[in-house]
């Protein structure tokens, strides 16, 4: 009888293994939730984008929005191209 049983188990292993694994997984899942209990949900967490937006608004509140740099001043601080880094600076 046992050789017939083991031959059938070996032949139909995928059909037997999946339901067994499913039952073991379901029992483990529910047991873990039973032991752990309901999770504590923290208060409303703000995302990184919202925090950044608030920080930027706070920075804007403290300064005069009519005083801005001219485009000529901004052009002086633009980095040189990567390919020109090793070239000698012409006087």
UniProtKB/Swiss-Prot annotation:
It is a single-pass membrane protein. The keyword Transit peptide does not apply. The chain crosses the membrane at residues 12-34. Its main location: membrane. GO terms for cellular component: membrane. It is found in: Membrane. Keywords: Membrane, Transmembrane, Transmembrane helix. Belongs to the SMIM12 family. This is Small integral membrane protein 12. It comes from Danio rerio. The gene is smim12.
């Amino acid at each position: 009888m046992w050789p017939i049983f083991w031959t059938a188990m070996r032949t139909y292993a995928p059909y037997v293994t999946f339901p067994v694994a499913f039952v073991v997984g379901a029992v483990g899942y529910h047991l873990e939730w039973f032991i752990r209990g309901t999770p504590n949900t923290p208060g409303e967490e703000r995302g990184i984008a919202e925090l950044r937006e608030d920080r930027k608004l706070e920075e804007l509140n403290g300064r005069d929005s009519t005083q801005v740099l001219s485009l000529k001043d901004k052009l002086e601080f633009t980095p040189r191209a990567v390919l020109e880094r090793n070239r000698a600076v012409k006087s």
